[in-house]
Swiss-Prot record:
This is E3 ubiquitin-protein ligase At4g11680. Residues 1-19 have a biased composition (Low complexity). It comes from Arabidopsis thaliana. Mediates E2-dependent protein ubiquitination in vitro. The chain crosses the membrane at residues 109-129, 142-162, 212-232, 244-264, 265-285. Pfam families: zf-RING_2. It catalyses: S-ubiquitinyl-[E2 ubiquitin-conjugating enzyme]-L-cysteine + [acceptor protein]-L-lysine = [E2 ubiquitin-conjugating enzyme]-L-cysteine + N(6)-ubiquitinyl-[acceptor protein]-L-lysine.
Length: 390
């Protein structure tokens, strides 16, 4: 009796498992791009040829923002952000990282950096001359000289890196017609070029060594100042306060950078539309043009009045605008949400569908495509698709 009941339960479980819907086959014919904006837990992402040739060049620099976004969403939200929304924020973090890297070596920032370090060197030399009669019980003069050498090395590395980036950037910008090929890839290409040259660039190695040495040198200076105590402040006040100021500035910059990284992480995680709007306002048009964006189909979302009548319990229907034979698609509750702003589609809102079949709010995706022509979810390049159609 027990054996027959067990066989019955086995057959029922097998039939139930066979009747379960499978969630495979959600990609197009070439198996690269997902056709729905919300993906299963095992997500297949589009990997470019450049990324495959250098598989670790992005992971180290981007890991901090990605892990911060995941942690903040776990800790501060009522519900965990779904995987597609996290992918969008990881893409936005990469975009910010690439633009920050390019901005850090722009002409005004490089000029201010060199001017700032020259001021430190000049102040150090002046205090060393004025305090020639002071006799500290700790080798503070050695520490000040070492600090000045670090400033000189930093300025040299910045100048070399700035000139290297300019040499790499001018061939990209000077092509004229090359912008029509893929103008949105300017920042991506620059980031990939600099990452590829990192292993063979002496300036990068020297800058990394200088950074590590400056950290160790700061600890040594802090120890000497602390060990000297009140004797230093009375016997060598100029050298003492110079070291205190240099140490304090270093701490200030570290705290400032950490706080800025936290603010950026919070903004990317919680206020991504604001970040996109700021980049849209201040950045040059490096992505798709308005004409390229307007060529993509626009849809209007309509909420369903009676959900029970629809198989699959769809949340609403998106209907193509501006055509005599509009295409209609029903959206499930999981799909009826914008991955950028994390807001559910309201009745009558306009949606934009990309060639990869991912859809977003028009106001959200249009600004993103103005900055970067790649889909924020699967990184499909809409300009490449437009050129192939031509």
């Amino acid at each position: 009796m027990s054996s027959s009941s067990s066989t019955t339960t086995n057959t029922t479980t097998e039939s139930d498992s066979s009747s379960l819907p499978t969630h495979i086959g959600r990609s197009n014919s070439d198996g690269i791009i997902d056709t729905t904006p919300f993906l299963p837990p095992t997500v297949t992402r589009t990997i470019s040829v450049d990324e495959e040739s250098n598989p670790i060049h992005r992971s180290a620099r981007r890991q901090g923002l990605r892990e911060a976004a995941r942690f903040l969403r776990h800790a501060g939200s009522r519900r965990m952000m779904r995987e597609p929304s996290m992918l969008v924020r990881e893409t936005a973090a990469e975009q910010l990282e690439e633009r920050q890297s390019d901005w850090a070596y722009s002409k005004p920032v490089v000029f201010l950096d060199i001017l700032w370090n020259l001021a430190f060197v000049a102040i150090g030399v002046a205090v060393l001359i004025l305090s020639r009669d002071e006799k500290p019980n700790m080798p503070l003069r050695v520490w000040v000289v070492g600090y000045g050498i670090q400033c000189w090395l930093h300025m040299a590395c910045v100048c070399v890196e700035y000139r290297r980036r300019r040499r790499r950037r001018h061939p990209e910008d000077g092509g004229g017609s090359g912008l029509t090929n893929s103008s949105s890839q300017q920042y991506v290409s620059l980031a990939q070029l600099e990452d590829r040259g990192e292993t063979s660039n002496p300036a990068k190695h020297l800058e990394s060594a200088n950074t590590m040495f400056s950290f160790i040198w700061w600890i040594i200076g802090f120890y000497w100042v602390s060990a000297g105590g009140q004797t230093l402040s009375s016997d060598s006040p100029q050298l003492y306060w110079l070291c205190i100021i240099f140490l304090g500035f270093d701490v200030f910059f570290v705290v400032f950078c950490v706080a800025l990284a936290c603010v950026i992480g919070l903004a990317v995680c919680c206020c991504l539309p604001c970040i996109i709007a700021i980049l849209y306002a201040v950045a040059d048009q490096e992505g798709a043009s308005k004409n390229d964006i307007d060529q993509m189909p626009k849809f209007r979302f309509t909420k369903t009045g009676n959900v029970e009548k629809l198989s699959g319990k769809a949340r609403g229907i998106m209907t193509e605008c501006g055509t005599d034979s509009p295409i209609e698609r029903s959206l499930s509750p999981e799909d009826a949400e914008c991955c950028i702003c994390l807001c559910e589609y309201e009745d009558g809102v306009e949606l934009r569908e990309l060639p990869c079949n991912h859809h977003f709010h028009c106001t959200c995706i249009d600004k993103w495509l103005h900055i970067n022509s790649r889909c924020p979810l699967c990184k499909f390049n809409i300009l490449k698709n437009a050129n192939n159609e031509v």
